[in-house]
A protein has these predicted regions:
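Bacterial N-terminal signal peptides
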Residues: 11-20
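Bacterial N-terminal signal peptides that target proteins for export
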Residues: 2-10
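Primary mode marks residue(s) on the alpha4-beta5-alpha5 output face of response regulator receiver
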Residues: 34-246
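Signal peptide processing junction and immediate N-terminal pro/mature segment
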Residues: 22-34
Length: 246
């Protein structure tokens, strides 16, 4: 019952984001003006100093992810086992196949053999190629807890934040160089959102971290994206308005 309720909540959030998050994830299609706004909608954990056991711990999680991914080279097997594609009809660089049951469990307990999402790339023939996995934690988890799961000296967990839902009649303002709403918009505060008649969400989803265990470059194994080209400047200290509210 609790898992079903959690799934319904996730479905409601997915509906809220439909039509905006897909474009966000497909960053190569976004104009430079929009990119400057994205920093106000993502919080990334700062890198911590490396501790003696951090690399070993991170390597163990990556190995567990690789083993968990092994049965799902064929995306149809993932679908058959309860993974659902997030926004399958929206063009994206990476497609998240999410198992809500694992997402619920991850809010209370970390099991690296049960990644919340499998990450696929669309292939030219319309199929999907498995490239990575995603682990999650609840919104209110502390950075110390995240560090216990995957060390913050190696991986940077992230949250999507400061989402202003557009009022009826203004949904076109989710997009374009003058976007105001959503994950690409210029609005990053509750006050500004209210002034434009929107509904403000301090954060959407919870904590996330991506792992790409097939990568040979250690820097790419724990990158936010498999090419990780747009998050380099999104540091903990360089982003105004990024503190989380509960």
């Amino acid at each position: 019952m609790v898992v079903r309720r959690f799934s319904r909540v996730l479905a409601a959030v997915f509906f809220l984001l439909a039509g905006t998050v897909g474009l966000y994830l497909h960053r190569r299609t976004v104009m430079a003006a929009d990119m400057s706004h994205m920093a106000g909608h993502m919080y990334m954990t700062p890198l911590r100093p490396m501790q003696p056991s951090d690399q070993q711990k991170a390597d163990a999680v990556a190995a567990a992810a690789k083993q968990a991914m092994a049965p799902y080279q064929d995306y149809k097997k993932a679908l058959a086992d309860g993974y659902e594609i997030f926004l399958p009809n929206v063009p994206q660089h990476i497609y998240h196949f999410t198992k809500h049951e694992y997402g619920f469990e991850a809010a209370f307990h970390f099991d690296p053999s049960k990644p919340t999402s499998l990450l696929y790339k669309k292939t030219p023939d319309g199929s999907y190629k498995l490239v990575g996995a995603m682990y999650t934690d609840r919104v209110r988890a502390s950075e110390d807890e995240l560090n216990e799961r995957v060390p913050l000296s190696i991986a940077r967990w992230h949250q999507h934040i400061n989402f202003c839902k557009a009022p009826e009649g203004r949904k076109a303002e989710y997009f374009g160089p003058d976007a105001k709403f959503g994950l690409l918009g210029s609005i990053t505060t509750e006050e500004a959102c209210a002034a434009h008649g929107g509904k403000f969400y301090p954060h959407i989803f919870g904590w996330m971290v991506h792992v790409y265990p097939y990568e040979t470059d250690p820097k790419k194994i724990w990158s936010v994206d498999d090419d990780d080209q747009d998050h380099d400047n999104m540091s903990h200290s360089a982003m105004p308005g990024m503190q989380m509210k509960d």
